[in-house]
């Protein structure tokens, strides 16, 4: 696999109130091309939108790929790279025996990741990373649309 086969993705979630109306956005770059994705939910949380952005971006790819996935959510990155094995081993319970929040999204995200080779990168949000800023703008667009603003 060459560098031109590499796909780079930035994802972000947004929520107006938490919970409240929210949106998700993703920027996908490959071989000189770009694709923007976004959507929203009228009643959600920021974490759910962060997770949805990753799921939607990965599910938009039509073949197994080598991906650099840039996220500004340590919740998403750590959840999939550190915590999920323990949650599954413990019957989807946290270390303090409480049910894992957003279990259905964790399961969907894990499934979406299976066919890809992913390098997870945490980027600081609102700090000038061009891809992250674009994903943030898309997430805000998704939020605005579910709130009835265009």
From Swiss-Prot:
Cleaved signal peptide residues: none
GO annotations of cellular component type: cytoplasm
Region feature (Disordered): 129-150
Cellular localisation: Cytoplasm
Keyword field: Cytoplasm, Endonuclease, Hydrolase, Magnesium, Metal-binding, Nuclease
Reaction it catalyzes: Endonucleolytic cleavage to 5'-phosphomonoester
Listed GO MF terms: magnesium ion binding; nucleic acid binding; RNA-DNA hybrid ribonuclease activity
UniProt binding sites for Mg(2+) 1: 12, 50, 72
Major subcellular site: cytoplasm
Enzyme class, UniProt record, top EC level: hydrolase
Listed EC numbers: 3.1.26.4
Gene Ontology biological-process entries: DNA replication, removal of RNA primer
Function text: Endonuclease that specifically degrades the RNA of RNA-DNA hybrids.
Family, similarity comment: Belongs to the RNase H family.
Subunit structure: Monomer.
Protein name (record): Ribonuclease H
Organism: Hyphomonas neptunium (strain ATCC 15444)
């Amino acid at each position: 696999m060459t560098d031109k086969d590499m796909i780079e993705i930035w994802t972000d979630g947004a929520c107006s109130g938490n919970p409240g109306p929210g949106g998700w956005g993703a920027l996908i770059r490959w071989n000189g091309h770009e694709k923007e994705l976004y959507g929203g939910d009228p009643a959600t949380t920021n974490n759910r939108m962060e997770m949805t952005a990753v799921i939607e971006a990965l599910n938009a790819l039509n073949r197994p790929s080598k991906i650099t996935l840039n996220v500004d959510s340590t919740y998403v990155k750590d959840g999939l790279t550190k915590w999920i094995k323990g949650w599954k081993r413990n019957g989807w319970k946290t270390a303090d025996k409480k049910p894992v929040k957003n279990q259905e999204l964790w399961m969907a995200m894990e499934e979406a990741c299976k066919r890809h080779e992913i390098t997870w990168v945490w980027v600081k949000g609102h700090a000038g990373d061009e891809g992250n800023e674009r994903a943030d703008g898309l997430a805000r667009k998704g939020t605005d649309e579910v709130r009835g603003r265009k």
